[in-house]
Each structure stands twice: as C-alpha cells, then as structure tokens.
Amino acid sequence: MEKRIVCLAGDGVGPEVMESAKEVLHMVERLYGHHFHLQDEYFGGSAIDLNGQPLPQRTLAACLASDAVLLGAVGGPRWDSAKERPEKGLLALRKGLGVFANVRPVTVESATAHLSPLKKADEIDFVVVRELTGGIYFSYPKERTDEVATDTLTYHRHEIERIVSYAFQLASKRKKKVTSIDKANVLESSKLWRTVTEEVALRYPDVELEHILVDAAAMELIRNPGRFDVIVTENLFGDILSDEASVLAGSLGMLPSASHAEKGPSLYEPIHGSAPDIAGKNKANPIAMMRSVAMMLGQSFGLTREGCAIEEAISAVLKLGKCTADIGGTETTTSFTKAVMQEMEEQALVGRGR
C-alpha cells in the first residue's frame, strides 16, 4: 500500500513525538511492505514564526491533498502575546478539513493501572465521540459589551444525526452500547439532540441506547467508568468530558485521538499539549503519538493488523517495566521508541516463524 501523510510537528514536544511516529511508520513499511510518503509542513507557533500565520495556505492545501494528517502538538507561552495564537490554527485546520467527529478511545494498560486515580482502572475501555463543528463554539451571534456578553448554542438536525450515526456505527463493532450525554431537562438544543438520537437508534436495534444528563455523566465517569462503551455528545460537553476521561489513564501522554470528515483526510493527534517545560529534553512520552499512528493505519487505511502490531508492541514494552518519566520510569523519548520498534520486529519474526 502507498499513502501520503502530512506531518505537522507543531510546537513544544511536537517535533520529538512526531519523530517517534515517523520511526514507527518506517518500521511498518519495512515489516509489511507498505510505502508512506511523509510530507512535513509548518503549523502552529512554528508557522507564526515563519510567516505570521498559524495555518499557512500551503499547509492546508497539502493536508487536503493527503490521505491522512498527523499532528504533534500546538501552542505554548512563547506566543501568548502574539497577534495570532497557534491554537487558532487548529480550529482553522479542523474547519478546512471538514472534520466533524472527534474520537478519543480511553483505555488503561494493566502495567500502568496503578497510576490511575481510580481503583480497578484496568476495566476501563470506552470511546468518547464529540461533535466538532457545531454548538456554542461556532454559533452566532456572539456579542460582548462592558456589561453583558452573549454566546449562542445552535444545533441543526443534520449535524446531530451525522455524529450520532457515527457513534452507533462504532458501537455496533464494539460492546453495542451508546450513551448519549445532553442537558435535555434545560436546553432546547439538547431536547432536539435527544429526539434525533432516539430516531437514529431505531436503525440499530442491536445497540443499546441510554441518555444521561451531563452533570450526572461527569460523576459517572469517575464513579463507574466501566459502564460506558461509546459516549456521544455535543461540542462543549465533549470538550470537557473527554478531558476529564483522559485523566483516568494516569497520564495525558497515553491517549490518542482522531477527527473524521464525511470525505477527505482525517486528522490524528495525541491528546496532550505541547509541554514546553520538557520540550527539547527527550522526556516526552511518545505513546499517545504512536497510538495515533495505529488509529490512522486502522481507521484511514484499513491496515488493522499493522495498527494492532503497534498497540501490542507498546503493551509488551510497558509490561517489561520500560516507561517514560510521566508514568514512573526512566526511559527517554528515543529509548522508548526504539524499544517499541524492536518489539514490533520481534513479534513479526515470531509470527512468520509459526
């Protein structure tokens, strides 16, 4: 297989974890006979430094022409007083790609379950599906004076149906349960959300549907996260709840994410930030970035075997006690990456020898 991947290393630890992603992709090429054209483009703060814009037209054009986009990290205090903020580029990139579904799998490795703030953390295995293009972040009017400020929360039927349908399709391949999170006891937009969700559910009779109000959901994520399979919710609620859920893994450096469009390339990125305090020190945890690569291989390219090989190698290395500093170890970004690559190679040799 031959695919073109645009690599947006971005800021902070982004270039370091992106290098890990590239090395893993090169290992996949060697072991499985694929070829990936990796195209580097400027994005975020590094792009602002170059030409004053966080998302240059050249970068967006390259992304649109690609088969998938990998993003390292964006932002940092260096650009806090800049006219253009790096994070603005991320919103523009999502809009330019037309991605509407943000997918965050939340799992806990048995080898690192002790780092989770919860007991029985190794029972956690769910996915948060967040609507990305509607809701209060993108609705108008937005107004502010010295005395009053106004934001508008709007959702259209087709936006709700699109994201909920995606969640049901995903659940049908997992444990067949969808939890829809809203505030239908108060918000008109949530009442429409619940109505449309129930209509979509009729098309998936083998998938269980439950509704939970967002405040109760925030509590249940901590009290009983094992009850969830696929969570689907609107933009603001998803923004908050997915960050809450990410803490369950014990480190932000463990979890990947994907953002999908109806057509065109998807965007894959770790959920952690740019971590400027450790940038350039070879301390960043590359697991979330490598898992983002695994998601890309499976979800965009249909290379499930190759994606699983990366995941299995990561788990095997962790079970050997090899961990980066954020999860209680002494491995560097490069040494952990090399350990995963070696494990991938060894597992491939064992598989071929059977």
UniProtKB/Swiss-Prot annotation:
Cofactor(s) named in the record: Mg(2+); Mn(2+)
List locations, semicolon-separated. Cytoplasm
Task: Please list the GO terms describing molecular function.
Answer: 3-isopropylmalate dehydrogenase activity; magnesium ion binding; NAD binding
Name the site position(s) for Important for catalysis. 137, 183
Catalyses: (2R,3S)-3-isopropylmalate + NAD(+) = 4-methyl-2-oxopentanoate + CO2 + NADH
What does the entry list as the binding residues for Mg(2+)?
215, 239, 243
Binding-site residues, NAD(+): 76-87, 273-285
Listed Pfam families: Iso_dh
Positions with a binding annotation for substrate? 94, 104, 130, 215
SUPFAM superfamilies listed in its UniProt record = Isocitrate/Isopropylmalate dehydrogenase-like
Give the record's GO CC terms.
cytosol
The biological pathway it contributes to is: Amino-acid biosynthesis; L-leucine biosynthesis; L-leucine from 3-methyl-2-oxobutanoate: step 3/4
Q: Kindly list the biological process annotations in GO that this record carries.
A: L-leucine biosynthetic process
Known EC number:
1.1.1.85
Extract the InterPro entries matched here. Answer: IsoCit/isopropylmalate_DH_CS, IsoPropMal-DH-like_dom, Isopropylmalate_DH
HAMAP family, per database record: LeuB_type1 (MF_01033)
Job description of the protein? Catalyzes the oxidation of 3-carboxy-2-hydroxy-4-methylpentanoate (3-isopropylmalate) to 3-carboxy-4-methyl-2-oxopentanoate. The product decarboxylates to 4-methyl-2 oxopentanoate.
**How is the subunit organization of this protein annotated in UniProt?**
Homodimer.
Q: Which NCBIfam families match?
A: leuB
Q: Which family does it belong to?
A: Belongs to the isocitrate and isopropylmalate dehydrogenases family. LeuB type 1 subfamily.
Protein name, UniProt field? 3-isopropylmalate dehydrogenase
The organism encoding this protein is Bacillus cereus (strain ATCC 10987 / NRS 248)
